[in-house]
Amino acid sequence: MSFLLPKLTSKKEVDQAIKSTAEKVLVLRFGRDEDPVCLQLDDILSKTSSDLSKMAAIYLVDVDQTAVYTQYFDISYIPSTVFFFNGQHMKVDYGSPDHTKFVGSFKTKQDFIDLIEVIYRGAMRGKLIVQSPIDPKNIPKYDLLYQDI
């Protein structure tokens, strides 16, 4: 289903999407097209994109073609989903140490829709961090890796 969503293949394209997406949540899915978990997430993203079209713009970003952002957002697990609103990086408290991105696939379409609604409403009120509406048991668990520690 990843063929249904627009792809960003360079740093310049990602920069342009961040700068030009106004009054909507910008969803950037970092991953690889052939990865099974990425395909599962892409299916959820593509099925919800029309329902969320007034609140969100969804793009796929290949981690191998945008190494600058992969390093900047510390994308060590794929898929990782990063959110922006009017050029501002939106953070979400998932109950984990990392609030900068969602790692893994969403369990259901409704989890993704609820998260976008919460980010959108919070951003419209000027918040840069919001509380995740997703049930903690539906959030994938992972260990943070730090270099040289």
Curated annotation (Swiss-Prot):
GO terms for biological process: mRNA splicing, via spliceosome. Pfam families: DIM1 (PF02966). Keywords: Cell cycle, mRNA processing, mRNA splicing, Nucleus. The keyword Coiled coil does not apply. Belongs to the DIM1 family. Homodimer. Interacts with the U5-102 kDa protein subunit of the spliceosome. It comes from Homo sapiens (Human). This is Thioredoxin-like protein 4B. SMART domains: DIM1. It is found in: Nucleus. Its main location: nucleus. Essential role in pre-mRNA splicing. Required in cell cycle progression for S/G(2) transition. The keyword DNA repair does not apply. One of its GO terms (cellular component) is U5 snRNP. The lineage of its organism: Eukaryota, Metazoa, Chordata, Craniata, Vertebrata. It comes from the Eukaryota. InterPro entries: Dim1, Thioredoxin-like_sf.
